[in-house]
Amino acid sequence: MKVRPSVRKICDKCCLIRRHRKLLVICSNPKHKQRQG
């Protein structure tokens, strides 16, 4: 999980999800997991 000030989709399988006022990127590739913080 990477924590970044700005999250974005890296590939086509990445999807942006909003949970508890946090933006998350979830993907089949575990390297693409991101969280905004």
From Swiss-Prot:
Instruction: Report the domain of life of the source organism.
Output: Eukaryota
Any idea which GO molecular function terms this record carries?
structural constituent of ribosome
> What keyword terms does UniProt attach to this protein?
Chloroplast, Plastid, Ribonucleoprotein, Ribosomal protein
Kindly list the places in or outside the cell where this protein is found, as annotated in its UniProt entry.
Plastid, Chloroplast
One GO BP annotation here? translation
Report the InterPro entries cross-referenced here: Ribosomal_bL36, Ribosomal_bL36_sp
Q: SUPFAM superfamilies in the record, alphabetically?
A: Ribosomal protein L36
**GO cellular component, as recorded:** chloroplast; ribonucleoprotein complex; ribosome
Q: Per the record's keyword annotation, is Ribosomal protein included, yes or no?
A: yes
HAMAP family in UniProt: Ribosomal_bL36
What NCBIfam families does the database record attribute to this sequence? rpmJ_bact (TIGR01022)
UniProt record similarity statement:
Belongs to the bacterial ribosomal protein bL36 family.
Q: Which PANTHER family match?
A: 50S RIBOSOMAL PROTEIN L36, CHLOROPLASTIC, LARGE RIBOSOMAL SUBUNIT PROTEIN BL36C
**This chain belongs to which protein, by name?**
Large ribosomal subunit protein bL36c
Which organism encodes this protein? Nephroselmis olivacea (Green alga)
